[in-house]
Amino acid sequence: MNKQAVLSLSGGMDSSTLLLHLLADGYEVTCLSFDYGQKHNIELQRAKELVKYLNAHSRYEDEQYYAKVKHQVITLKGLDKLLNSALVKGGDDVPEGHYAEDNMKATVVPNRNKIFSSIIQAAALSIAEQKGKSCAIAMGIHAGDHSVYPDCRQEFRDADFEAFKLGNWGSEKVYLYTPYLLGDKFDILKDGERCCTFLHLNFDKVYAKTNTSYKPIKLKVYYNEGEDTVESEEWFSDYKSASSVERVEAFIKLGRKDPVQYADEFGPVTWEYVKEFVSSILENYEDAKTTNI
């Protein structure tokens, strides 16, 4: 395995799928996750769980080696106190509804991708110099992000990468890899299904180790252990915030049940209930667009 990549791994569905994509394409991957004070920091635990699962399943197959994934969580201590966003601790409530609605702009974290990309660029350039070969900067940004998050748009990514090239010697050894830039979450999930098949991975086990929810819910759960009833706390995804709506829509289109557990303020809910709720949001959004034409 010769190709190198540094991946921004949030623990969400998009970057987790891109990790599978890179492995299936023969990359050796260094994953960087960022703790910037996000409310939904369960995503960092999911990232760790996924990397652990993938490393346990690395092997030779058809003369290709799926190498162990390197992973590091970078803590940006104190950054949340400087940021105005519903996604960070101390910010406003995370809005609910369709992911294309204007109120979703409250979930923008100022300059987030620029902050992350600067660190990722530095790591990629260092790897390229150490190994004497080119290194990709991989990000799972996609078309569904463009209307809400300006730092996910092609023009920003191009300008940011140009600034990196201008500011560093040897930058020609690094290239930008954003295969989902023109696709949506459904396209990403389809690619994830393909990669799981290629890598002989269990799709449900992989995607159970991802978090897309901006409003995860911690609930007490009880299970039997022999004759005893054991109490535990587990994280559930919400199904009303925009990020969750977009994820559920992708699973509906793919015709698969989402393996993550969903809940609301009243407790756990079934996948059928989640599908029905999200379908109604999507229908209402389309009806509103038609009315406004």
Question: Which residues does each predicted region cover?
Answer:
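ATP/NTP-dependent adenylation/nucleotidyl-transfer catalytic domains that generate, transfer
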Residues: N2-K3, K70, T75-G78, G91-V108, ...
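ATP-dependent adenylation/nucleotidyltransferase module used to activate substrates
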Residues: M1-H200, S244
